[in-house]
Amino acid sequence: MSGPALTHIDSAGEASMVDVGDKTETVRVAVAEGFVRMKPETLALIREGNAKKGDVIATARLAGIMAAKQTSSLIPLCHPLMLTKVSVEIAPDDALPGLRVEAMAKLTGRTGVEMEALTAVSVACLTIYDMAKAADRDMEIGGVRLVSKSGGRSGDYRREGDMR
């Protein structure tokens, strides 16, 4: 069977950390996204800054940034990385209704930052849920996915259909 191989499985079929020591350092950037769907009145509460636990958007943004920096502690085979930039943008979306989350992670290094961007989005979404659950336990977290990545041996990737 040919095709892409799983990089974290060794010849004996065991999980192992990839050796990136021989890779060339390049600028790596990854963007991920997700959303938290909620009742319109919950979104209004967050917009007005009246959530019981405080500023939901600011707290979720910080949680996402902190999570990206802790990715290797959370996901067993991820390398600890010296991230040079992490940003988390959270925007209300009345059509959802809810909040859309986008994270970007960047570094100059030997391995990609896709997991860091995905972790940032995931934890930002979880933080939104935690901070607003008193008002709306029916919230739904979804759409967590890689949007794009650049740098490295495998080249650039952009999710089809996205115009970013």
UniProtKB/Swiss-Prot annotation:
**A Pfam family reported for this protein in Swiss-Prot or TrEMBL:** MoaC
According to its UniProt entry, what is the function of this protein?
A: Catalyzes the conversion of (8S)-3',8-cyclo-7,8-dihydroguanosine 5'-triphosphate to cyclic pyranopterin monophosphate (cPMP).
Q: Which Gene3D superfamilies match?
A: Molybdopterin cofactor biosynthesis C (MoaC) domain (3.30.70.640)
Source domain of life is Bacteria
- GO MF terms, alphabetically ordered: cyclic pyranopterin monophosphate synthase activity
In this chain, substrate is annotated as bound at L77, C78, H79, M115, E116
Q: What is the lineage of its organism?
A: Bacteria, Pseudomonadati, Pseudomonadota, Alphaproteobacteria, Hyphomicrobiales
Give the reaction(s) catalysed. (8S)-3',8-cyclo-7,8-dihydroguanosine 5'-triphosphate = cyclic pyranopterin phosphate + diphosphate
Catalytic positions are: D130
Please report the name of this protein according to its UniProt entry.
Cyclic pyranopterin monophosphate synthase
Organism, as annotated:
Sinorhizobium medicae (strain WSM419) (Ensifer medicae)
Q: Does the keyword Repeat apply?
A: no
Query: Pathway it belongs to?
Result: Cofactor biosynthesis; molybdopterin biosynthesis
State the family it belongs to: Belongs to the MoaC family.
SUPFAM superfamilies tied to this protein: Molybdenum cofactor biosynthesis protein C, MoaC
UniProt keyword terms in alphabetical order:
Lyase, Molybdenum cofactor biosynthesis
